[in-house]
């Protein structure tokens, strides 16, 4: 299926997302910070990025903006996956270049529906 980069500083969240995605046939690459996510995206050229927001250093909004502004990664869609559930956060994510927004905790069916929707657009 697709190669998906998961960017999250929580090993538990990475494990949950990786398990769901691999169970559904996707190849998963991981990074534990916004900075590492940008570098990993350049190295692996994933089909999609799942990006946490609250991380030390560069947050997920900043990393998403960087990915959307760099020519080599600008066409890689990003889905924000976060505990932040405010409408202002969702609007801000879109302004930074995110294609979709999922609130944690994720459920397998919902995650896969969002992933498939973004990958098919």
PLM feature spans:
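Short amphipathic alpha-helix used as the core "switch/output" element in two-component signaling
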Residues: 39, 61-74
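Active-site beta3 strand of CheY-like receiver
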Residues: 44-50
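Receiver (REC) domain active-site loop signature in two-component systems and cognate sites
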Residues: 55
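Alpha4 helix (beta4-alpha4-beta5 surface) of REC/receiver domains from two-component response regulators
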Residues: 15-18, 62, 85-100, 109-113
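Helix N-cap/capping motif at the beta->alpha junctions
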Residues: 30-39, 60
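A Lys-centered signature of the CheY-like receiver
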Residues: 104
């Amino acid at each position: 299926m697709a190669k998906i980069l998961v960017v999250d500083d929580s090993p538990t969240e990475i494990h949950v997302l990786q398990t769901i995605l691999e169970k559904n046939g996707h190849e998963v690459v991981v990074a534990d910070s916004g900075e590492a996510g940008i570098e990993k995206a350049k190295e692996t050229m994933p089909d999609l990025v799942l990006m946490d927001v609250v991380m030390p250093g560069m947050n997920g909004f900043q990393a998403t903006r960087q990915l959307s502004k760099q020519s080599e990664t600008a066409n890689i869609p990003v889905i924000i996956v976060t505990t932040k559930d405010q409408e202002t956060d969702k609007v801000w994510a879109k302004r930074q270049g995110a294609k979709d927004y999922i609130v944690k905790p994720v459920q397998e069916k919902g995650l896969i529906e969002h992933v498939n929707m973004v990958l098919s657009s």
